[in-house]
Curated annotation (Swiss-Prot):
Homodimer which binds Holliday junction (HJ) DNA. The HJ becomes 2-fold symmetrical on binding to RuvC with unstacked arms; it has a different conformation from HJ DNA in complex with RuvA. In the full resolvosome a probable DNA-RuvA(4)-RuvB(12)-RuvC(2) complex forms which resolves the HJ. The active site is at D7, E66, D138. Its cofactor is Mg(2+). The lineage of its organism: Bacteria, Pseudomonadati, Pseudomonadota, Alphaproteobacteria, Rhodobacterales. One of its GO terms (cellular component) is cytoplasm. It comes from Cereibacter sphaeroides (strain ATCC 17025 / ATH 2.4.3). Mg(2+) 1 binds at D7, D138. Keywords: Cytoplasm, DNA damage, DNA recombination, DNA repair, DNA-binding, Endonuclease, Hydrolase, Magnesium, Metal-binding, Nuclease. This is Crossover junction endodeoxyribonuclease RuvC. It catalyses: Endonucleolytic cleavage at a junction such as a reciprocal single-stranded crossover between two homologous DNA duplexes (Holliday junction). Mg(2+) 2 binds at E66.
Amino acid sequence: MRVLGIDPGLRNMGWGVIDVSGTRLAHVANGICHSDSGDLAQRLLSLHRQLTDILARFAPDTAAVEHTFVNKDGVATLKLGQARGIALLVPAQAGLAVGEYAPNAVKKTVVGVGHAAKEQIQHMVRLHLPGVELAGADAADALAVAICHAHHVQSSGRLEAALARAAR
C-alpha cells in the first residue's frame, strides 16, 4: 500500500510518500509545495496543481491529512483552513480515501508522546524510515502523518479480522 501524508500549510505544504508492506515501512519521496505571497486564489491554485502533480507522479493508494488548529489570529486560521481544503480535495478528486488525524495523535503514534517537539518528530521519522533525507520540517510532519495512517490502517485491519474470527 502506498500512502501520501500531507501537512497543510498555505506558504509551505509538506508531503511525504511511503510504501507499507505488512509492518515494514519504506520511504518513497518527500517534499514541500510552496506558494508565493500574493493573491490567495492563485496561491491555492498553485498548491492544487503541485499536489495534483505529486499524486500523478507517485500514485498513492490512500492519503492522510493532519488537522489544523485554531489560533488567536482568525484570518490566518481561515487561510490555513483553505489550504487544508486543497489537501483534502486533491486526493478525493483522485478517488482516494483520506484519513484525518489530530497533530497530537500523529505525535503519539510516531514519537510516543502527544506533545513532541519538531526535532523529536524528525528524529523518529528518520528511525522509522532509515536513510530518508528530509526536505524540511513540513515534509517530516507529512511523513509522520503517513506513518500514523499506516499504523491506523493496520490496526483497523487487525481489529476487523479479530471481529470476523469471533463472529464465526
